[in-house]
């Protein structure tokens, strides 16, 4: 059963999510090494400055923030495994998260939800390009389900119980818009 706040975020970002998904060549299995590495570099350029702030906020223990804070490490591992030494350009304007509030949870919804999408892409790439490093796409691996459920429970208890669904939705929309714009500006998203 989907939680009320999750439903608000899912419905309120559906068009943005679809735009992002349809723009990714990876989703079609249309992948070559150069495009894949460019995608990883662009994603890292967006995620690193955001992750540095997002998971350093004063979140309660039940959100398990320290376990969520290593996604940029996985991207660096993939680039290193591929022998990629191209410079990383960082997004100058990722979503601004300043407090552990509903807005930041909306941003985190996009970051954490990408772990579900990454697993889908990893399965697809295993059959079309198994030689490409996929640590980031594998994400939390067997912990993806428990971590996602814990995130949704916290999201619902914080944003839903305090009638802050609109703030969470704005954070999620800003994250999708920022990520899509950044990937497009870096040539990592189809037009």
Explain the meaning of each model-derived region.
Residues 1-191:
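Metal- and O2-centered redox machinery and metal/ROS homeostasis
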């Amino acid at each position: 059963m989907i939680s009320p706040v999750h439903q608000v975020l899912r419905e309120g970002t559906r068009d943005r999510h679809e735009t992002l998904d349809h723009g990714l060549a990876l989703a079609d299995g249309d992948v070559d090494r150069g495009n894949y590495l460019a995608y990883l570099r662009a994603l890292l350029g967006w995620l690193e400055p955001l992750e540095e702030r997002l998971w350093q906020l004063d979140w309660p223990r039940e959100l398990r923030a320290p376990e969520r804070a290593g996604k940029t490490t996985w991207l660096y591992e993939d680039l290193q495994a591929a022998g990629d030494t191209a410079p990383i350009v960082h997004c100058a304007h990722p979503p601004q998260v300043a407090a552990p509030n509903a807005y930041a949870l909306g941003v985190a919804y996009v970051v954490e939800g990408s772990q579900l999408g990454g697993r889908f892409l990893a399965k697809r790439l295993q059959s079309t390009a198994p030689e490409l490093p996929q640590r980031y796409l594998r994400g939390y691996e067997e912990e993806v389900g428990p971590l996602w459920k814990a995130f949704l429970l916290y999201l619902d208890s914080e944003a839903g119980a305090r009638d802050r669904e609109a703030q969470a939705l704005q954070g999620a929309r800003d994250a999708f818009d920022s990520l899509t714009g950044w990937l497009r500006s870096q040539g990592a998203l189809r037009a």
